[in-house]
């Protein structure tokens, strides 16, 4: 690609503000169905009683009337420096600025904070959805800053344009950096709805029993699996839903929900009991999943970062290219001679992380990062860093148009694009093939360099994609090339990830996957050997419609893996005890027991030092 062409394209594509907003290219028309629906038996938006069941989840605020015309359906909390952000969602606009009344006394909410609203032309719109309490299209952001640390505050969302006033709710602000008290965090990845009921139950329990916050490392809701129920079972995919004849990877017992007979007219398929993860509509998957999580996101901050399932409406075609026929030519239950899915195959509202950017609000703007993609925050003795393992680095899994073009092109042709093309969400100055050209790399370097290890001796980084695993994939090399050097240089203690749908704890690894034997005390205790090695944990077992991962033919455990569990679902509990010890525990979803534990120790002379890199 010519340098001038690349520069022009990157200027057009790069984000221009810290709070990224989706930019969707529409040079070529979308030619698929008005509303893609993954159910040939019931291809309706609201359901006709046939086909796959249509779920209903309670909204965050119970409406005061039986037939509301607007409602607050989702409420979620997230940290901002010295405060809290309150995000809430409604099907229709408020007719005024969103607001929150708040105070320290639940009987005297004597302060009011206002914010802003945003929306997108979702497919289908909420005006096409009959149930007002099951749809979100307007997203409201209210930040309350200047708050006291480690303090409980109360708040209420007032009624506006037909919504019902919320109950008086509460949140607890973050502990200040350096606070010596112990705390726990719920860490999860790859959580949909199907196969995640146990994880959800344990997560709700954790949220009510004092867990400080939840940290979800990508793949939220599995909205892009809306079409799994129309894909016939295939030999190269281990999931086949067929009632009591269903087959799933992992080797565990068949979940009860899979024993339900297929609805009349449906075929054995690559999906699950709902067709898609929760719904046969992309946007309804998002709506239902967020409402299912209300009893967590209302109680504790829910911090998120991007995964591959947030990028677009689909990742791949199915048998006989059934999705190409449907999305490109509006032919239901058809076939196509070739897989021809492109960036333009998805409805415009289902491209380029659009839903993800609207449905959450992370502290990118406040921490020098970008939107929900990369940001950091302190809590007590730890500094937490969320990075984007999907876009915005060289050879990223979801690349941008600049990597599609050839010759002197400034934009790719339709056929040169891929369905998951996304970003960049930060600025790019230089070649797209050099990670140091990307804003994210420079932000990460600056963020890690500023960490005061005398206050936050523990530094934990998470992205969706692992750097290493016994299940090797080429993206792991690119993630390492982008970030591993910085993490080692600045003495990061642990790198957390998901993407692979199992639990895999690795031995401490230095550059190029060298096992740091000096950091291994025993199989369940490591030293934080800052600058020499990093503890890597793959935490992708929360549960979703795709079930567990399996090794490909010829693969198996390698010597970097200390423990592998590809049978159980669950999340992980990270407990920071003090400046020299933390504990990591796998919490099994089926019974809440501990399936694995790791203690990470840090010598006191290292924990108190500010400079941990050469």
From Swiss-Prot:
<feature type="glycosylation site" description="N-linked (GlcNAc...) asparagine">
    <location>
        <position position="352"/>
    </location>
</feature>
<feature type="propeptide">
    <location>
        <begin position="606"/>
        <end position="614"/>
    </location>
</feature>
<feature type="domain" description="Fibronectin type-III">
    <location>
        <begin position="80"/>
        <end position="176"/>
    </location>
</feature>
<dbReference type="Pfam" id="PF00149">
    <property type="entry name" value="Metallophos"/>
</dbReference>
<feature type="signal peptide">
    <location>
        <begin position="1"/>
        <end position="22"/>
    </location>
</feature>
<feature type="glycosylation site" description="N-linked (GlcNAc...) asparagine">
    <location>
        <position position="578"/>
    </location>
</feature>
<dbReference type="InterPro" id="IPR041792">
    <property type="entry name" value="MPP_PAP"/>
</dbReference>
<feature type="glycosylation site" description="N-linked (GlcNAc...) asparagine">
    <location>
        <position position="161"/>
    </location>
</feature>
<comment type="subunit">
    <text>Monomer.</text>
</comment>
<feature type="glycosylation site" description="N-linked (GlcNAc...) asparagine">
    <location>
        <position position="512"/>
    </location>
</feature>
<keyword id="KW-0732">Signal</keyword>
<feature type="glycosylation site" description="N-linked (GlcNAc...) asparagine">
    <location>
        <position position="242"/>
    </location>
</feature>
<keyword id="KW-0378">Hydrolase</keyword>
<dbReference type="Pfam" id="PF14008">
    <property type="entry name" value="Metallophos_C"/>
</dbReference>
<dbReference type="InterPro" id="IPR039331">
    <property type="entry name" value="PPA-like"/>
</dbReference>
<keyword id="KW-0325">Glycoprotein</keyword>
<feature type="glycosylation site" description="N-linked (GlcNAc...) asparagine">
    <location>
        <position position="429"/>
    </location>
</feature>
<dbReference type="InterPro" id="IPR004843">
    <property type="entry name" value="Calcineurin-like_PHP_ApaH"/>
</dbReference>
<dbReference type="InterPro" id="IPR015914">
    <property type="entry name" value="Purple_acid_Pase_N"/>
</dbReference>
<keyword id="KW-0186">Copper</keyword>
<feature type="glycosylation site" description="N-linked (GlcNAc...) asparagine">
    <location>
        <position position="333"/>
    </location>
</feature>
<dbReference type="Pfam" id="PF16656">
    <property type="entry name" value="Pur_ac_phosph_N"/>
</dbReference>
<feature type="glycosylation site" description="N-linked (GlcNAc...) asparagine">
    <location>
        <position position="295"/>
    </location>
</feature>
<dbReference type="GO" id="GO:0005576">
    <property type="term" value="C:extracellular region"/>
</dbReference>
<dbReference type="GO" id="GO:0003993">
    <property type="term" value="F:acid phosphatase activity"/>
</dbReference>
<dbReference type="GO" id="GO:0046872">
    <property type="term" value="F:metal ion binding"/>
</dbReference>
<feature type="glycosylation site" description="N-linked (GlcNAc...) asparagine">
    <location>
        <position position="523"/>
    </location>
</feature>
<dbReference type="InterPro" id="IPR008963">
    <property type="entry name" value="Purple_acid_Pase-like_N"/>
</dbReference>
<feature type="glycosylation site" description="N-linked (GlcNAc...) asparagine">
    <location>
        <position position="110"/>
    </location>
</feature>
<protein>
    <recommendedName>
        <fullName>Acid phosphatase</fullName>
        <ecNumber>3.1.3.2</ecNumber>
    </recommendedName>
</protein>
<keyword id="KW-0964">Secreted</keyword>
<feature type="glycosylation site" description="N-linked (GlcNAc...) asparagine">
    <location>
        <position position="559"/>
    </location>
</feature>
<dbReference type="InterPro" id="IPR003961">
    <property type="entry name" value="FN3_dom"/>
</dbReference>
<feature type="glycosylation site" description="N-linked (GlcNAc...) asparagine">
    <location>
        <position position="340"/>
    </location>
</feature>
<feature type="glycosylation site" description="N-linked (GlcNAc...) asparagine">
    <location>
        <position position="408"/>
    </location>
</feature>
<dbReference type="InterPro" id="IPR025733">
    <property type="entry name" value="Purple_acid_PPase_C_dom"/>
</dbReference>
<dbReference type="InterPro" id="IPR029052">
    <property type="entry name" value="Metallo-depent_PP-like"/>
</dbReference>
<dbReference type="InterPro" id="IPR014390">
    <property type="entry name" value="Acid_Pase_Asper"/>
</dbReference>
């Amino acid at each position: 690609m010519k340098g001038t062409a690349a520069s022009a394209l990157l200027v057009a594509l790069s984000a221009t503000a810290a709070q990224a907003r989706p930019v969707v290219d529409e040079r070529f028309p979308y030619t698929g169905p008005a509303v893609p629906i993954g159910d040939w038996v019931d291809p309706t938006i609201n359901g006709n009683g046939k086909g796959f069941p249509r779920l209903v989840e309670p909204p965050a605020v119970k409406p005061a009337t039986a037939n509301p015309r607007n409602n607050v359906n989702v409420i979620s909390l997230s940290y901002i420096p010295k405060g809290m952000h309150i995000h809430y969602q409604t099907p229709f606009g408020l007719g005024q600025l969103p607001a929150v009344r708040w105070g320290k006394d639940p009987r005297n909410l004597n302060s009011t904070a206002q914010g802003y609203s945003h929306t997108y032309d979702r497919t289908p719109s909420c005006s096409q959805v009959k149930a007002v309490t099951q749809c979100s299209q307007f997203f409201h952001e209210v930040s309350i800053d200047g708050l006291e640390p480690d303090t409980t505050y109360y708040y209420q969302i007032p009624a506006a344009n037909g919504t019902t006033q919320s109950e008086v709710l509460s949140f607890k602000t973050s502990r200040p950096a350096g606070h010596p008290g112990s705390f726990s965090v719920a860490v999860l990845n790859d959580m949909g709805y199907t196969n995640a009921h146990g994880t959800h139950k344990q997560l709700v329990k954790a949220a009510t029993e004092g867990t400080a916050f939840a940290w979800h490392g990508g793949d939220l809701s599995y909205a892009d699996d809306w079409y799994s129920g129309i894909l016939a079972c295939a030999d190269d995919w281990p999931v086949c839903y067929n009632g009591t004849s269903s087959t799933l990877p992992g080797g565990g017992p068949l979940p009860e929900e899979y024993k339900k007979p297929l609805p009349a007219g449906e075929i054995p398929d690559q999906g699950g009991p709902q067709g898609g993860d929760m719904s046969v509509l992309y946007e309804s998957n998002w709506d239902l999943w967020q409402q299912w999580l209300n009893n967590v996101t209302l109680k504790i901050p829910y911090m998120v970062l991007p995964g591959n399932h947030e990028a677009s409406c689909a990742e791949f075609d199915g048998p006989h290219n059934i999705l190409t026929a449907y999305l490109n030519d509006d032919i239901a239950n058809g076939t196509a001679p070739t897989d021809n899915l492109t960036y333009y195959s998805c409805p415009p509202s289902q491209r380029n992380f659009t839903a993800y950017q609207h449905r959450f609000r992370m502290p990118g703007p406040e921490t020098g990062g970008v939107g929900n993609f990369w940001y950091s925050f302190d809590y007590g003795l730890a500094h937490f860093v969320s990075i984007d393992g999907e876009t915005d680095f060289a050879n990223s899994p979801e690349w941008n148009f600049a990597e599609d073009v050839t010759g002197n092109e400034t934009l790719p042709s339709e056929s040169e694009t891929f369905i998951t093309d996304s970003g960049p969400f930060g600025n790019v100055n230089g070649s797209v093939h050099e990670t140091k050209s990307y804003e994210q790399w420079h932000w990460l370097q600056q963020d890690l360099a500023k960490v005061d290890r005398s206050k936050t001796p523990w530094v934990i980084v998470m992205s969706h994609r692992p750097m290493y695993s016994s299940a090797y994939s080429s993206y792991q090399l690119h993630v390492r090339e982008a970030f591993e050097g910085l993490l080692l240089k600045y003495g990061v203690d642990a790198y957390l990830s998901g993407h692979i749908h199992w639990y895999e704890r690795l031995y401490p690894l230095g550059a190029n996957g060298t096992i740091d034997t000096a950091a291994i005390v025993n199989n369940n205790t490591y030293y934080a050997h800052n600058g020499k090695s990093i503890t890597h944990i793959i935490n992708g077992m929360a549960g979703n419609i795709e079930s567990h991962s399996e090794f490909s033919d010829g693969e198996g455990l390698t010597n970097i893996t200390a423990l592998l569990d590809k049978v159980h679902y669950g999340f992980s509990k990270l407990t920071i005890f003090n400046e020299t010890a933390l504990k990591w525990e796998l919490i099994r979803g089926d019974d809440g027991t501990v399936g694995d534990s790791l203690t990470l120790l840090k010598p006191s002379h290292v924990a108190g030092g500010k400079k941990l890199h050469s």
